[in-house]
Regions:
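Noncatalytic alpha-helical scaffold of FAD-dependent oxidoreductases
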Residues: 1-470
Length: 470
């Protein structure tokens, strides 16, 4: 627990109403969306501005108090779980859109702004912020930046880092710096902006961001391709890209996922096929119509049993909603849902899907697979019960093999969820000892007292695991 004098110091900075040391308050921020990770912080602090963040960090750095920066807690790698106590920083007061600059096509926001609020705000001005993580109704832009979040539109439009032009940051020692700006070109010094994107709160605190916008696409169309053979569906993904078409969305759902999603969303998805590709294209009408026709022909040539084009925006929106509800639908089946994001080059989608199915059979565990097939980002999802230790051990072994297979296929252990505590034991598989050492050097340079999100990225326990006991 924190000393009373330190608590009083925090209160003097942010006000009594913004320091919570109650059991209920601390319990609320002791876990995130990751199953079976939980640890109590000593206090929850809600700063009102960047200067207050800086003053809080100065105290924490002096007394070596762990700091866990938290958005809405939607991350799936135990990235915000306060494993070593200390304080959780929340941004309920720092949640304002500061400026929409139509001349420079930028939006400036505080870290606590909800992602969907950004998307809606710029849509009113016929502008477009493309990153669309499935959690966008809840997640904050600060969380998106720290995790470098992706989304359904990542294939065509990229991920969060492709839209962050500048940041306001507070370093662990309390220094406030600004990186980047409203510039199309800027090569002055190291690219600190990109260094902090995806750093998972281990290097400092993001308080503001300047984000790039693009013009709103003129139109869009959505289609479904249905397959009796899951491998043919996977091969169709590579074939579409090989035909020089980059759709806005190219999603994959296997049969178990389809059945659960249809029961949940009830939009008329066919449940008697082995796989579905959900494909969307946007842009000028002539380009959209041409590409949809081409992709339909490609899917048919890859033995799709049917290709269906949404008749109107309402039907298209229902299909998008169904895909975004996959995790919610699957999570209803059993008490514990392990959602992973092994990612491979899109040319390796078919062998990766085959491997996931073989591994699930080998360990006798249910794994449903869906995800952003167009960029190789698959979500093998296991429905289990953490109270069943024997089954959990099998799940642990299965995911270890899935990660190893992704690496074997020139992929990665995580495409968008991040490393956090859950994936830390696997990071060396991807980077090697030398890569880990390079990252530790960066960490030491910015945060020599290791106050920022300790217990994440760098594994203290070499045991491979997907969950830990409370």
């Amino acid at each position: 627990m924190l000393e009373k004098q330190i608590i009083h110091s925090f209160v003097s900075i942010v006000g009594e109403d913004n320091v919570d040391t109650s059991n209920m308050g601390r319990l609320t921020y002791s876990y995130d969306a990751t199953p079976n990770f939980q640890a109590m912080p000593d206090a929850v602090i809600a700063p009102r501005n960047t200067n207050e963040v800086a003053e809080v960090l100065k105290i924490c750095n002096t007394h070596k108090i762990p700091v866990y920066v938290r958005g809405s807690g939607t991350n799936l790698c135990a990235g915000t779980c306060p494993l070593e106590g200390g304080i959780v920083l929340i941004f309920r007061h720092m949640n304002n859109i500061l400026e929409i600059d139509e001349e420079n096509l930028t939006i400036t926001v505080q870290a606590g702004v909800i992602t969907l609020d950004i998307i809606k705000a710029v849509e009113e001005k016929s502008l477009f912020y493309p990153p669309d993580p499935s959690s966008m109704k809840i997640s904050t832009i600060g969380g998106n930046i720290n995790e470098n979040s992706g989304g359904l539109r990542g294939l065509k439009y990229g991920v969060t880092r492709d839209y962050v032009m500048g940041l306001e940051l507070v370093l662990p020692n309390g220094d406030i710096i600004r990186t980047g700006g409203k510039l199309a070109k800027d090569v002055a010094g190291y690219d600190l902006t990109r260094l902090f994107i995806g750093s998972e709160g281990t290097l400092g605190v993001v308080t503001e961001a300047i984000l790039k916008l693009v013009p709103m696409p003129e139109t869009k169309k959505t289609m479904l391709a249905l397959y009796e053979d899951i491998n043919e569906a996977a091969r169709a993904v590579s074939s579409i890209i090989a035909n020089k078409i980059i759709p806005a969305t190219l999603e994959f759902l296997d049969q178990p996922t389809i059945e659960v999603v249809e029961e949940f969303a009830q939009i008329g998805l066919p449940t008697d096929v082995k796989a579905i590709l959900l494909i969307e294209q946007d842009g000028p009408p002539e380009v959209v119509n041409r590409d949809i026709e081409k992709m339909a022909n490609v899917c048919r040539s890859m033995n799709a049993v049917d290709v269906r084009i949404a008749k109107d925006e309402a039907e298209a929106d229902a299909l998008r909603t169904a895909r975004r509800s996959a995790l919610s639908a699957l999570a209803r089946l059993k008490p514990t849902t392990i959602l992973e994001d092994a990612t491979v080059p899109r040319s390796q989608i078919a062998p990766m899907v085959e491997a996931i199915n073989a591994i699930a059979k080998k360990y006798n565990i249910p794994i449903c697979t869906f995800g952003h097939a167009g960029d190789g980002n698959l979500h093998p999802t296991c429905m289990t019960d953490a109270r069943n230790e024997e089954e959990m051990h099998r799940a642990e072994q299965a995911f270890a093999e899935i990660f190893a297979k992704a690496i074997e296929l020139d992929g990665t252990i995580t495409g968008e969820h991040g490393v956090g505590a859950m994936k830390a034991p696997y990071l060396e598989m991807k980077l090697g000892k030398e890569g880990i050492a390079a990252m530790q050097g960066i960490k030491q340079a910015f945060d020599p007292n290791n106050i920022m999100n300790p217990g994440k990225m760098f594994a203290k326990d070499t045991r491979k695991r997907v969950v830990v006991e409370r």
